[in-house]
């Protein structure tokens, strides 16, 4: 217990609280880290349309490398949103790469037969569109949707590690929480049955390149 004559102790306590608040405000690891997630990478069904003769993590990294130049246009926004919402910017970049190749395949900001909007392909049938297709408001909306999926997976699978729950949330971003039934088979039912594995492998690449 601090006394009136313990100013140094009080200073140390305040410094500790300040440091703790700094971690909470500026951190990006609230939902786990892609660096610790196991992944099989892209399926051949995802890799083949990209003109690749190989599959797996190597294919995911090749695709991410191709997207890096375009992704870097949004790096500041992606990192800002990641820090604000306490999730790794690399995860956001991985989803943007998978959903829109960092905007390269969109037409006037739209994809998925006119249903998906923006870099993160927010579906207009289920969400009220926010911001411009490549702006911070859009990235923030897509990331909030992702975090909501992660939180629902946390409640559904409380015994999973944070990293496993993050991977489950990524899978649910594509096919919904109901599609995630087990850790090993969470991607069955996602597009090409590889969504979270491909996104995680791409995210690992982006994390190694400053995201």
Curated annotation (Swiss-Prot):
Q: List the disulfide bonds.
A: 30-86, 44-55
Q: Name any GO cellular component annotation.
A: extracellular region
Q: Which InterPro entries match?
A: Glyco_hydro_23 (IPR002152), Lysozyme-like_dom_sf (IPR023346)
| Keywords assigned by UniProt, alphabetized | Antimicrobial, Bacteriolytic enzyme, Disulfide bond, Glycosidase, Hydrolase, Secreted, Signal
Q: Which GO terms describe its molecular function?
A: lysozyme activity
According to UniProt, the reaction catalysed is: Hydrolysis of (1->4)-beta-linkages between N-acetylmuramic acid and N-acetyl-D-glucosamine residues in a peptidoglycan and between N-acetyl-D-glucosamine residues in chitodextrins
| Protein localization | Secreted
- Signal peptide region: 1-26
Active site feature: 99, 112
According to its UniProt entry, one GO biological process term is: killing of cells of another organism
Q: In which tissues is it expressed?
A: Granulocyte compartment of myelomonocytic cells.
Catalytic activity, EC: 3.2.1.17
Task: Give the miscellaneous note.
Answer: Shows preference for N-acetylmuramic acid residues that are substituted with a peptide moiety. It acts only as a glycanohydrolase.
- Please report which protein family the annotation says this sequence is part of: Belongs to the glycosyl hydrolase 23 family.
Please identify the protein, giving its name as recorded. Lysozyme g
Organism name: Gallus gallus
